[in-house]
């Protein structure tokens, strides 16, 4: 049912829905240019006439110069970011869980855009809904890494990290 709803939405936006491309998500920072992959690298499945093609290689982001290709991610509760530089003719989509976010999946994706001729000033992004405070509990090991990451970005820790005294666990906001 959800693929049919997606098909309707994308058709309204003028997107092709005969095939969807998605990264083989593993909470890593690897970015793949799907234009450089041979067809046999994709693992594909047909869902009511819509072909879902997942990269055979592990990655959390994919890019393409073929703006007619429809990119998607199956995120769970992680952050999804769609990027496009229309002037350079490059678009991409990435999956950013807390680990990929901290380890640099966004930076790696933007760097690949630049390698392909994009200008950072022309890249536009769209953030999709994701996990927010109180969605799940995290321990001190994760929070210490996330705290360092937030500090590096100049974020106010209180805006992205909370502590639940009752459960004695931390929560983060990826939005």
Positions of predicted regions on the chain:
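Active-site microenvironment for binding and transforming phosphate-containing groups
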Residues: 1-175
């Amino acid at each position: 049912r959800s693929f049919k709803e997606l098909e309707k939405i994308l058709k309204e936006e003028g997107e092709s829905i005969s095939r969807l491309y998605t990264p083989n998500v593993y909470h890593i920072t690897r970015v793949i240019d799907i234009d450089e992959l041979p067809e046999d690298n994709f693992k594909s499945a047909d869902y009511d006439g819509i072909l879902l093609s997942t990269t055979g290689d592990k990655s959390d982001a994919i890019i393409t110069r073929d703006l007619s290709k429809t990119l998607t991610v199956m995120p769970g509760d992680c952050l999804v970011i769609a990027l496009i530089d229309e002037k350079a003719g490059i678009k991409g989509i990435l999956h950013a869980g807390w680990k990929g976010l901290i380890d640099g999946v966004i930076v790696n994706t933007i760097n690949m855009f630049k390698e392909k001729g994009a200008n950072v000033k022309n890249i536009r992004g769209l953030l999709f809904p994701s996990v927010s405070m109180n969605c799940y509990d995290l321990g001190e090991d994760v929070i210490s890494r996330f705290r360092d990451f937030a500090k590096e970005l100049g974020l106010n820790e209180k805006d992205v990290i909370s502590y639940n005294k009752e459960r004695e666990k931390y929560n983060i906001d990826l939005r």
